[in-house]
C-alpha cells in the first residue's frame, strides 16, 4: 500500500497546478475524446481498402493463387446457402471476380521442409470456389507457427508437422 500511495501523491502534486483545467465537466471531456476517437476510426476504416479487412492479413499486400487441394480446413463450416450462391455468381462473372476478397491462410513450414496451409475463415468463399470446381483460390499467406495453430485447434492441433 505504501508503494501505491507514493505514486498517488506524486501524481496529485503534479496536477495541482492544473486546477482550472481539472474543474471542467469530466463528461464533456470524455464525450469529446470518444467523438474524436470515433471520427479517427471512421477515417482510418474508410482509408483502408476492402481487401484489408482481417486482423491477420491487414499488413499483407501480396495475394497468391493457392491450389484448393493443399488447403486444410479442420473445422466444419456452417454455411448460408444464399451467401454461397451470391458469391458463386460474382466469381463466375470475370469482371466482378476481383470484388471477392482473398481468404487468409495460416502458412506453416514443416520441420522437414513441407508447407502446410490451414484455413479457418472465408468459409463461404472457399465453398463457392469449390462448387465452381476452381483449381485455385485467391489467398493471403499469413506466416504462422504450430503455436498459432494450437490457438485455433486446441489439443486437436498436430504436435509437429514433417
From Swiss-Prot:
Organism placement in taxonomy: Eukaryota, Metazoa, Ecdysozoa, Arthropoda, Hexapoda
Enzyme Commission numbers on file: 1.8.98.2
Positions bearing Omega-N-methylarginine: 24, 38
InterPro entries, per database record: ParB/Sulfiredoxin_dom, ParB/Sulfiredoxin_sf, Sulfiredoxin
PANTHER family reported for this sequence: PTHR21348, SULFIREDOXIN-1 (PTHR21348:SF2)
Superkingdom: Eukaryota
SMART domains, sorted: ParB
Reaction(s) this enzyme catalyzes, per UniProt: S-hydroxy-S-oxy-L-cysteinyl-[peroxiredoxin] + [protein]-dithiol + ATP = S-hydroxy-L-cysteinyl-[peroxiredoxin] + [protein]-disulfide + ADP + phosphate
GO MF, one example: sulfiredoxin activity
UniProt-listed GO biological process terms: cellular oxidant detoxification; cellular response to oxidative stress
Keywords: Antioxidant, ATP-binding, Disulfide bond, Methylation, Nucleotide-binding, Oxidoreductase
Protein name: Sulfiredoxin
Gene disruption phenotype: Five day old adults display increased levels of hyperoxidized forms of peroxiredoxins, and both males and females show increased locomotor activity. No effect on lifespan under normal or oxidative stress conditions.
Entry's family note: Belongs to the sulfiredoxin family.
Role of this protein: Contributes to oxidative stress resistance by reducing cysteine-sulfinic acid formed under exposure to oxidants in a peroxiredoxin. May catalyze the reduction in a multi-step process by acting both as a specific phosphotransferase and a thioltransferase.
Residues bound to ATP: 122-125
Cellular compartments per GO CC: cytoplasm; cytosol
Amino acid at each position: 500500500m505504501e508503494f501505491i500511495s507514493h505514486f498517488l501523491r506524486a501524481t496529485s502534486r503534479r496536477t495541482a497546478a492544473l486546477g482550472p483545467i481539472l474543474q471542467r465537466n469530466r463528461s464533456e471531456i470524455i464525450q469529446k475524446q470518444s467523438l474524436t476517437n470515433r471520427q479517427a476510426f471512421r477515417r482510418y476504416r474508410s482509408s483502408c481498402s476492402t481487401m484489408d479487412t482481417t486482423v491477420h492479413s491487414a499488413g499483407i499486400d501480396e495475394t497468391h493463387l493457392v491450389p484448393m487441394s493443399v488447403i486444410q480446413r479442420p473445422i466444419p463450416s456452417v454455411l448460408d446457402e444464399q451467401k454461397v450462391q451470391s458469391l458463386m455468381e460474382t466469381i463466375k462473372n470475370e469482371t466482378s471476380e476481383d470484388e471477392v476478397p482473398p481468404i487468409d491462410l495460416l502458412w506453416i513450414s514443416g520441420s522437414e521442409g513441407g508447407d502446410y496451409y490451414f484455413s479457418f475463415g472465408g468459409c463461404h468463399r472457399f465453398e463457392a470456389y469449390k462448387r465452381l470446381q476452381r483449381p485455385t483460390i485467391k489467398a493471403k499467406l499469413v506466416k504462422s507457427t504450430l503455436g498459432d495453430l494450437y490457438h485455433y485447434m486446441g489439443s486437436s492441433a498436430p504436435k509437429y508437422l514433417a
